[in-house]
Curated annotation (Swiss-Prot):
This is PKHD-type hydroxylase Mfla_2317. Fe cation binds at H96, D98, H159. SMART domains: P4Hc. It is an enzyme of class 1 (oxidoreductase). 2-oxoglutarate binds at R169. InterPro entries: Oxoglu/Fe-dep_dioxygenase_dom, PKHD_C, PKHD_hydroxylase, Pro_4_hyd_alph, Pro_4_hyd_alph_FE2OG_OXY. One of its GO terms (molecular function) is iron ion binding.
Amino acid sequence: MLIEIPEVLTKEQVAQCRQLMDAAEWVDGNVTSGSQSALAKNNMQLPEGSPVARQVGDLIQDALGMSPLFISAALPLKVFPPLFNRYEGGQAFGTHVDNAIRQLRGTNFRIRSDLSATLFFSEPEDYDGGVLTIEDTFGIQEVKLPAGHMVLYPSSSLHHVTPVTRGVRVSSFFWMQSMIRDDAQRTLLFQLDGSIQAIGAERGAGDPEVIRLTGVYHNLLRMWADS
């Protein structure tokens, strides 16, 4: 399941974050690569744990916590602190799959990567290329979203970023461990939650069918969830 989540950050927040990031020091993006990714990766990255990365990352995590669409789609258990990359001058990221396990450097914090996310900090018209192309059971999807918008997709997906031939592409990328390991089960719960919300808006939260379906949702969540 691939989900676009609009306006995770406002345009004002994006501008403030870009001001901080544009003034920061960037390093070779391979500092966070696995062995496979290192062969395909050519970009720059904010150092993990840098003050700017922490500040903007905290803002992103706070915003995600207030996004009903994100919570419904991801059912997050743990979120890896957001990282940040920058592409320009022909830089690209070849086809790869994300590592199954991610550990935060110098800590015992680690997650199973069930879902991957990219949050855009550059407007589509400000750069050429830089298309995130994702391959999975839903087919091949090309993603290039407005600044402040985010895409969420299974970490098991093959994906790549096409060369940036004009301008600069800045984004945040991170992973999360969902309470629901299986993508098909997570998709079913997301669809069921959406139907409950739609019926509830039409009939009211006290409608017997809304109550019954809400019970079904929570019983499935109870059956499948890790916590």
